[in-house]
A protein has these predicted regions:
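Extracellular repetitive beta-rich solenoid segments
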Residues: 1-22, 51-58, 64-72, 81-85, ...
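Glycine-rich, low-complexity segments
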Residues: 12-46, 52-53, 126, 132-139
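Short beta-strand/loop motifs in extracellular/secreted proteins, especially
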Residues: 56-58, 74, 127-131
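A short, polar/proline- and glycine-enriched secondary-structure boundary/capping micro-motif
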Residues: 100-107, 126-132
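Short beta-strand-plus-loop segments that form exposed binding edges in beta-rich domains
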Residues: 119-123
């Protein structure tokens, strides 16, 4: 499919898979990634999407890694409710794993129909944090 490249010669083979956002044959699935520099208690938006009455539920799988040796993986369930610009989203974190320290609390904020996934760093967490995530939407 699109974004998949396989190459090689002799005993060496390489497969490259490049993530893409929604659309195509699976519009309910998207990926994202990046990094942010933080201090404790700072909230950073790590993903946004338009919510509408057709999207009832979104599930995120999130991975965070901090330059100070902390890692975190978890799920976040986002339930959408309402219509038009009055949409509301509720979120629940679960399956939280981390070592040795939790990096952030993950939540959502809705403004003018845009749902923002946020990471609020925990006490003692500073520096560059890298994240990757996937989002699966259900209508």
């Amino acid at each position: 499919g699109s974004g998949v490249v396989a190459s090689g010669s002799g005993a060496t083979k390489t497969i490259t898979i490049a993530g893409g956002g929604g659309g195509g044959t699976n519009p309910g699935f998207s990926t994202a990634g990046g990094n942010f520099t933080v201090n404790a208690g700072v909230t950073t938006v790590i993903d946004t999407f338009n919510i509408n009455t057709n999207t009832k539920l979104s599930e995120y799988t999130v991975h965070l890694e901090n330059v100070n040796g902390n890692i975190q993986s978890q799920k976040v369930l986002v339930m959408n409710y309402g219509a038009g610009l009055g949409l509301t989203a509720y979120s629940s974190e679960y399956g939280i794993m981390f070592h040795p320290n939790q990096i952030a609390d993950i939540g959502v904020v809705v403004t003018a129909g845009i749902c923002s996934l946020t990471a609020t760093t925990k006490t003692g967490i500073t520096g560059i944090t890298t994240f990757s995530l996937t989002r699966q939407d259900q209508s």
